[in-house]
Amino acid sequence: MEIKHKKNRSLYIPYAGPVLLEFPLLNKGSAFSMEERSNFNLLGLLPEVVETIEEQAERAWRQFEDFKTDIDKHIYLRNIQDTNETLFYRLLENHLEVMMPIIYTPTVGSACERFSEIYRRARGVFISWPNRHNMDDILQNVPIHNIKVIVVTDGERILGLGDQGIGGMGIPIGKLSLYTACGGISPAYTLPIVLDVGTNNQQLLNDPLYMGWRHPRITDDEYYAFVDDFIQAVKQRWPNVLLQFEDFAQKNAMPLLERYRDEICCFNDDIQGTAAVTLGTLIAASRAAGSQLSEQKIVFLGAGSAGCGIAEQIIAWMRTEGGLSDEQARARVFMVDRFGLLTDNMPNLLSFQSKLVQKRDSLKGWDTQSDSISLLDVVRNAKPDILIGVSGQTGLFTEEIIREMHKHCARPIVMPLSNPTSRVEATPHDILNWTDGAALVATGSPFQPVTVKEKTYPIAQCNNAYIFPGIGLGIISSGALRVTDEMMMAASEALASHSPLVNTGSGLVLPPLTDIQQVSKDIAFAVGKMAQQQGVAVKTSAEALLQAIEENFWLPEYRSYRRTSI
C-alpha cells in the first residue's frame, strides 16, 4: 500500500468497517462524516455526533490533564497515537511545549525502562537474532511501501540509562513522533525499528514480563554481520530511505556510522545531531556576546562518541569561520573523561579519541595535582569560556569547578547536556547561583526558569529536536543520497539564525518550541541547498526546493475519503 499526502486531495481507501477504525494512520474516530460512515460501513459503529478534530483534541486535552504522573500521561498519548495518529499530532501541535517532555525526554526514559510492563500494542519492527535469516521477509511484512525515514536502535545505550534491551524501542518511536510534530514528515513515511540482539541487563533477563530475546548480547563479528544483513535488507526494501542510528553503545556507534555513511543515506543522532544542535547553540551564544566561536576555549566532560562528535563539528566550524588551521582549532578543545584530560601519552584510546588529545609537552606550565589531569585542573589552567557535559553522570560540575571557571570568564557558557534529568552534570539552579546569574546555561533536558537575586532566567534546552526533523525534511525534499558533515553545519547555522538572543538582544539563545516548525523548514532549506552544492542531490532552483519543502510538510488535518478496492 502507498499512502500519498497531497494537501486538500481526497484519499482513496480500500478498508472499511472495524478494520478502518483499527488503522491509526487512517482512523478519524468520531470525525468521520455521515457520508463516509455510510460508504465505509461505519454506521452504528460510532456515536451519532460528527465532531471536528479540534473538538476531539479538546476532549483529549482534558483527559490528558486528569492524569497525575508523567508516565501515565505518556501511556495515554501513546494510546492515542496507536488509535488515531492525526489526532495525536494535532494534540502535539496544540500543546507541544507541554507534551514534548512527555513523549520524549525525560519521560521516555521511564517508558523504556518499563517497556515490557506498559506494553499495549505493537508499533514498528522488531528484528531479533533468532530471526536473523528472515530479515527480508520481516521488512516485507511492513505494509507501507514508501517509508522515507527509519530510526533504529539496538537498545544498548538508552539515554543515560544503559542497556534497556528491547525497551529501547521507545526511543525510535519518540524520535519519529518529533520528526512529524516538528519537521512535518508524514507518519505514514516513518518506521521505528529495534535490533534485538539480546541484553546484558540482568534485571531484564530475570523479569518474567520482559518481551525481548532472553540472551546475553551478541557481540563482535556476529553482531556486525547481523547489522550488515539489516542494512542490506533495508537497502533492498527502501533504497532511498534516510536511516538514523540511535542510542548505540559507544564501542559500536562510531564504527557503524563510518561503516555505512557512504553506503546508505544515514546519520547518528547521538553523534551528529547532538553536535549540530550544540554547535548551533554555541554559534548563537558567541554572536550574542559579539565574538566568534573560533576565539573560545572549550572543555568537554565526557569523551565518548557524542562528546567527540560535538568536538569534531566545533573544530570544523572553527576552521571555516575563523580560518584556523586544524592544529590551532584542536588546541582550543580539551576532552576530559573518567581518567582525566586526554593527552597524547595516554594508552588504550579509541581511534576517534586519539584525534582530540592535547600534547603533553604543551601542558608543562600547568599547575596540576597529579599526572592524571582532572576537570578542575583543566578549568584552572586552560581558562575555558565554554564547559560542556556529556558524561551521563550527575553532579560532576561541582561548585568549585563552576566558580573557578567564573573567576576568569565573566559570562561562562555552561551546557550540562546529559539525559535524563537524573544524570545532569549540574542543575541550572546551581550553576546560576554559583555564578550570580552570569552564566549562559543550556541543558539537554527541560528545566524550569531559575530566579537569582530577583531576576528570572529561562533555561534553553539544547534539544536535538531543533535539528534532526529539519535535516530529515531537507533530505526528503532535496532527494539527497547521503548526509555530509557540511549539511550538518548548514543545519547548525540555520538554527543559530533563529536565536532570539542574537536577533533581539534578549530571551533564550534558542528559539521557542512554538517556532520549531518554521525553524525546521529553514533548516531543511539550508540542508537541501548544501546537499545540492555538494553533489549528493540534484540541483534545482531555490524556489523549487522551497516548494518541495512545503509540499512535503504534512499537517495533522483530516481529509475526505473515497472508497476503492485493494
Curated annotation (Swiss-Prot):
Keywords assigned: Metal-binding, NAD, Oxidoreductase
One Pfam family from the record: malic
Note on cofactor: Divalent metal cations. Prefers magnesium or manganese.
Catalytic reactions on record: (S)-malate + NAD(+) = pyruvate + CO2 + NADH; oxaloacetate + H(+) = pyruvate + CO2
InterPro entries, A to Z: Aminoacid_DH-like_N_sf (IPR046346), Malic_enzyme_CS (IPR015884), Malic_N_dom (IPR012301), Malic_N_dom_sf (IPR037062), Malic_NAD-bd (IPR012302), Malic_OxRdtase (IPR001891), NAD(P)-bd_dom_sf (IPR036291), NAD_malic_enz_proteobac (IPR023667)
Molecular function per GO: malate dehydrogenase (decarboxylating) (NAD+) activity; metal ion binding; NAD binding; oxaloacetate decarboxylase activity
Positions annotated to bind a divalent metal cation: 246-247, 270
Site location (Important for activity): 270
Cofactor or coenzyme needed: Mg(2+); Mn(2+)
Active-site residues, as the UniProt record annotates them: 104, 175
Binding site for NAD(+): 157, 270, 419
E.C. number(s) listed in UniProt: 1.1.1.38
GO cellular component: cytosol
GO BP annotations, alphabetical order: malate metabolic process
Family per similarity comment: Belongs to the malic enzymes family.
Subunit structure and binding partners: Homotetramer.
Name assigned to this protein: NAD-dependent malic enzyme
Native source species: Cronobacter sakazakii (strain ATCC BAA-894)
Lineage of origin: Bacteria, Pseudomonadati, Pseudomonadota, Gammaproteobacteria, Enterobacterales
Gene: maeA
